[in-house]
Amino acid sequence: MPKTIHRPETRVLIELIRDFRREAGLTQVELSTRIGRVQSFVSNVEQGQRRLDLIQLRDICRAMGVDLPTFVACLEERLD
């Protein structure tokens, strides 16, 4: 089984994060400030070079104004 970072589902996850960030009207810098990280952290996530744990994903979702269950439901919808 390939590493999860190389799976197609990860690409969908990354696209969803980017889409929610843009819908929230946030730049990578603004999002990174909200989560207490540097801009390169968000850039690496969106380029698929950085894995996220569940807590980091939750923090990102909250910073974008979406709760984690809603985000996961949108992810599942895109994956189906």
PLM regions: where:
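A short, Lys/Arg-rich alpha-helix, primarily the initiator
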Residues: 1-23
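Short amphipathic recognition helices of helix-turn-helix/homeodomain-type DNA-binding modules
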Residues: 70-80
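Recognition helix of helix-turn-helix/homeodomain-like DNA-binding domains
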Residues: 36-52
